[in-house]
Amino acid sequence: MQNAQIKSSSKGSGIDGTDRNSKDGVEKRPLEDVKQMIDAGTPDVGHKSTVETKPNVGWQASHSNLAALHEKEQKYEMEHHHARHKLHRQVIPDYTSASTAMFSDCMFNAAPDKVRSLSTMKSSGLSPKHPFNVVATFKGPFPQHSVESKPLDGGYSAKDHFPSFKMLQAQQHPAHRHYKDNDKYGLKSPSRSFVKDKKRLVHRFLKSMEPSSSGQSKDSSALAPAFDPILPNVISKPSKRPTHHSHSSDGSSSTQTDISLQSLLYHDLESSPKKHVSPSRPPSVASESSPAVANPIGLSPKDACNASFSQSSSSSLSSSSSSSSSTSFSQSVAVDPLEPPGNITYSSSNLSLNSDELDYYQRHIGLQLQQTEALLKHSLKDEVLKDENDLVKNIANFDKIVKELRDLRSRTIGWKELVEEDYLMNLKQDFDKENPESFEARLSDTINTNVAKLQDLEKRMASCKDRLASRKEVMRKMESLLSLENSLMISKKNVTFASKYRNEALDIVFLIIIIVICYTFKHLVSHK
């Protein structure tokens, strides 16, 4: 919505040409192309630029638009330089839950008044330019507030002061709402300005749902804007087309009043017939308009795709009819934020919406519905059907495994019965001690017999051992005799002839010596 306001406020043919090009791009891309693009799975860069270029205009403005805004801001600063520096800067409102309280605080407390006056808005720190300050009571086609008679918070009129371009950028960024150094720019603390009106947004939301007061006319009650939860930070500029603007008949400086196109769009959606989809309940609409997606199991994939296609087509037609019915509310005020308040021009009807913006929203909503439908069909085809096939395969595998388990169980039971009835009975009979024919009895008899034989054998072995010992002693003696005989035989073989008769020779010699000694001794004795 903020991007649409910037588009309407741009001058020249730059953004208008972009609007016409994007319009032609949307008209040249029917539903079949979008479906083919999503089914093919390839990103379409051109189509993406057609859909997403305009929503991003507010944050990615072109160089030409920024240059034009900067030139106009410099021109305005040169004209109102001295007057602007004498005034305080505008208070940055704080819309956090700490300042605006909760919905539950307002549900159990009575609201002060159904219609909040402009003085209450001044005490809360709101500017008449803010979309929430559009008073619910209209006098005529559109309220004409005197800006000079009702000064703002700082005690100055909107005619003598307009925030600079840098100040607008600071207000647009959400991070600047809670800075503690706002006082150095001459700004009031948001917590101080919202002390007396903490539940302002809650009352504003509840008042948008209540019927209008008796003093309001039918036209003015129909023109009351609904609660806008999204704050449009970009102020719309007047289009340069001569068909949408004309000077006021009285010629005096009219009040600078800004109605956001987003609030008007919400009002058109609320004032649409009951059969159309309400914008305040998107979850229920999604749940009612896509039964095939909510319950994909009850329908076949083809039926689910057809059902989602029919439901999204009906929702697209209803949104188109609601946006086309909004052309009856063809009155809007376009305000140039960089021009003095005295130079503001209004249309003859004072409330005429830009037809290009309405066409853009109609095409954008329809195209988004088509893309959502194609995305749902793509999800059904690529994810749900794939999951369904996997589920069928898993069920088949599960049945197969269950069958195998049953067969294995039956075989196990058969083995158990066979072991218990046949094998165990045979084992019990074989190991029965009382039965002489059993395996255990026969084995015991055999073992006892063999033990007796082994004992007899041991006795025989003992007697044999004794006899063997005696034989060993005899053999030892015989061996000693044999060894002596062998030594004698060896010595006989080793004796020579000299050694053999040496002893006899010695005996003879000794005998001769003895005889000689005896003869000598006898001779000596005989001679005496």
Swiss-Prot record:
It is found in: Endoplasmic reticulum membrane. It is a single-pass membrane protein. InterPro entries: HPH_family. It comes from the Eukaryota. GO terms for cellular component: endoplasmic reticulum; endoplasmic reticulum membrane. Residues 1-13, 283-296, 308-332 have a biased composition (Low complexity). Its main location: endoplasmic reticulum. One of its GO terms (biological process) is cellular response to alkaline pH. The chain crosses the membrane at residues 505-521. Required for growth under high NaCl, alkaline pH and cell wall stress. This is Protein HPH2.
